[in-house]
Amino acid sequence: TATALWAPTGGIVCPFNLAIAAGENASMNGVEFQFETEASSIEKTKDGYIIHTNKGDMETKAIVNAAGLYADVFHNMVSENKIHITARKGEYLFFDKSVGTIFNTTVVPLPGKMGKGIAASYTINGNFFIGPTATDVEDKEGLNTTAEILDKLKEMAASDGYLTRFPLPLNKVITSFAGARAHEDHHEFIVQELED
């Protein structure tokens, strides 16, 4: 019986450095960033869109909606086909580098209805971690960790055989954190042009 996914060609990146590198590449290729500019509403026009912001209006022929947790807000301003995004909070446990190399790849359990499950992996700096959990939450800004969820993660880490062949040393946990990801109610990534 299969209990985990193996992706031999998978890799690990630093999400912060990757985002900076992508931004630098975009800038070198002509993208003009509008920092500290908040879009308050979008109007559909005959030839495109008008984006109303705190720094004035912008006209454009196309919009790429990459608003993450708030993608539904902007989508629903211009489309009759409404969507709803739920914030799905994930919590992580990070271990000290002294935990060492438990294995040389990311291990992911078989996906369930709440997502890919709690993975075991490394950062590019060599810290081992487990997570994320998956809890649907109302507060899209709420990035606090919870004792109940962290206790469940610790229980998994201390058990023999959850993604590793031996229990993980809980005295080597150095931090925990949480993040939220966008989950569309129909369980789909939406990568397409609006139909209307």
Stretches found by the model and what they are:
Residues D57, A67-D196:
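Active-site substrate-recognition segment that forms the wall
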